[in-house]
Amino acid sequence: MTSGSPQVSSRALPSYVFPTVGPALFEALRAARPKRIVIQVPAGLVRNAHDLSSRVEQEVGVPVVLATRPCFGACDFPSIDEAPRADVAIVLGHAPIPNVSVVRPTYFVEMRQPGGDPEALAATVAAGGVPRRLGLVVSVQHLDLIEPFREALRLRGYEVQVGRGDRRLAYAAQALGCNYTSAEAVASQVDAFLFLGTGRFHPIGLAFAVERPVWSLDPLQNRLEPAIDRGALIRQRQLVVATVRDVRSWGILVSTFAGQDRTPMALALQERARARGRETQVLVFDRLDPRDLEGRALGAYVNTACPRIALDDGVNYPKPVLTPPEFLMAIGELPLEPYRFDTYH
């Protein structure tokens, strides 16, 4: 599962994966001869969406529509209902999830970025006191930087590990908000992890998933952020678990998104809850809104969709929302320690 030599190449990905918007993408689209294209963009690229739409329309010669619903990740590609007349989709900013089937021909454009100078980035890490036995995790946009950056760290005396995750991850070292198995694969060989990318979303998720300090480095600004306080994150979630141990009526949340549907897990949790004397109700949704859970005669919820709903947005809901492992803690089937991240495989 680890790599002592550069092995950050992809698994056998299909030809509809492209690093950037450019001639190769346009050529593939023209060859597909679509009648209409739908484009999905993440929040960070919305400002550029209209220019991109015009460019694709001009290059390919067919109508293009933009999906305006918020995009929550690679698991959340446009459904048939969102653009029923589009026979091809373009998804920007994400790699495909290998074990999730798409509903129409879909072209994933990962929006790769070169990032900063590897030597300068390594110097920043060394100056920041990051431990020398280090695991690297990266957002898909900065995958091309991993190898030169890893070599620059090695020249400064770092022992660097890159892990290969499970079947949900397309690349070694890759991070998904629901899956950090690339880090878990090498956790026993490192003293800390460094996330290479922007924002706190992945560092926080990684801190939940591994019992190691998690630092983060913005490769665009060459800015090193201190280690996440994992203890505080875990204590906060344990407090939520403690407050619902006496709850007798539970809602079990199930997503209809193709990449988030864990109906078998929901039904299994329902059986285990009933065996422990709890009442349960399964609730199905596509995009979950806190208002959807208002006024219901339920004491708490367990969410089988994206684990980040509970971990990042739980405070916005009218009743506590737990991940499946937290739910099993609450009904007495699992101990509070060690904390278990809800990895979506």
Which residues are covered by each model-predicted region?
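Cofactor-cradling patches in redox/metallo enzymes
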Residues: 41-52, 64, 258-266, 270, ...
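Short glycine-rich anion-binding loops that position phosphate/pyrophosphate groups of nucleotides
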Residues: 94-97, 198-201, 257-258, 306-309, ...
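The feature marks the mature, well-folded catalytic cores of soluble enzymes
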Residues: 8-24, 29-210, 214-226, 230-238
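Pyridoxal 5′-phosphate
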Residues: 2-4
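Peripheral docking tails and interdomain loops at the edges
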Residues: 220-224, 229-231, 307-345
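Redox- and metal-dependent alpha/beta enzyme cores, enriched for Fe-S-associated oxidoreductases
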Residues: 149-150, 201-280, 287-295
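Short loop/edge segments at beta-strand edges and connector loops
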Residues: 68, 164, 284-286, 323-325
